[in-house]
Regions:
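Membrane-embedded alpha-helical bundles that constitute the cytochrome b-like, heme-associated redox core
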Residues: 1-246
Length: 246
């Protein structure tokens, strides 16, 4: 009777797939969130309309801010799940950390150096994004041209949001690049050319989203500065104002 080796457990692969899927979801959410907040460049009315859309106002005939709270809570749970799955691959003690840094310096490969970037930005993002999402969960009705601008300027949230922007965009796009290499899609001919094309796309997307985010944040800061004497008052679009314009 022969002793056959035990079949490998499928769970590491399943958890790896779940980590990749949750990361992809968060990247797509990040891009949609950027598109949403960028609507402020079309004016206060545009941002107000988009905010009310996500509250279901045009389907339910009235805004339901709890919908935003529920989705923000869901995103926060996905972030926690993704972070927990990523922790599986962290070095467990200082010996493993030392071995990793030795190997990384020995390889001298830029893609290997991206892993500690992912760790640092992911660690910071977990805490910073939690603060941002908590504000959305407990006060969803404040997602409004003036409410958001007041938070940025009067609430002095802009330093946190700048750091969060940098961490989110770098972590998300680098993660997407690593995901594409890991799963082998898309491809552009031979592997070396694929890596070059994807890396150029990675840096271009990082620059695009950070630039867009900074410009958008500056727009909210300028609106918040002008609205500072009336901080706390939410925006009312012209078509909802009374005859006196109030």
């Amino acid at each position: 009777m022969t002793n056959r080796p035990a079949a490998p457990s499928p769970w590491p692969a399943r958890l790896d797939l779940l980590q990749s899927t949750s990361g992809l979801f968060l990247v797509l959410f990040m891009w949609l969130h950027m598109a949403f907040v960028s609507s402020i460049h079309l004016g206060e009315d545009a941002f107000w309309t988009v905010a009310r859309f996500f509250e279901g106002a045009f389907v339910l005939d009235r805004p339901v801010p709890a919908l935003v709270s529920a989705f923000a809570l869901f995103v926060l749970l996905v972030i926690a799940l993704h972070a927990g799955l990523a922790l599986r691959k962290f070095p467990a003690d200082w010996r493993q950390y030392r071995a990793f840094w030795t190997h990384m310096r020995g390889f001298g490969h830029q893609d290997t150096s991206l892993w500690p970037v992912q760790v640092a930005t992911g660690f910071a993002m977990f805490f910073l994004a939690s603060v941002h999402l908590y504000a959305m969960i407990v006060e969803p009705e404040a997602i409004d041209p003036y409410g958001s601008a007041d938070q940025v300027w009067t609430g002095r949230a802009w330093p946190l949001l700048v750091v969060l922007l940098l961490c989110v965009e770098v972590h998300g796009v680098v993660g997407l690049y690593r995901l594409a290499l890991k799963w082998g899609w898309p491809t552009f001919g031979d592997p070396a050319r694929t890596r070059r094309v994807l890396k150029r796309a990675m840096w271009a997307l990082i620059a695009l989203f950070i630039g867009t985010g900074l410009v958008t944040l500056d727009t909210f800061a300028r609106i918040g500065k002008a609205h500072a004497p009336h901080a706390g008052e939410l925006y009312t679009p012209p078509f909802l104002q009374g005859p006196s314009g109030q």
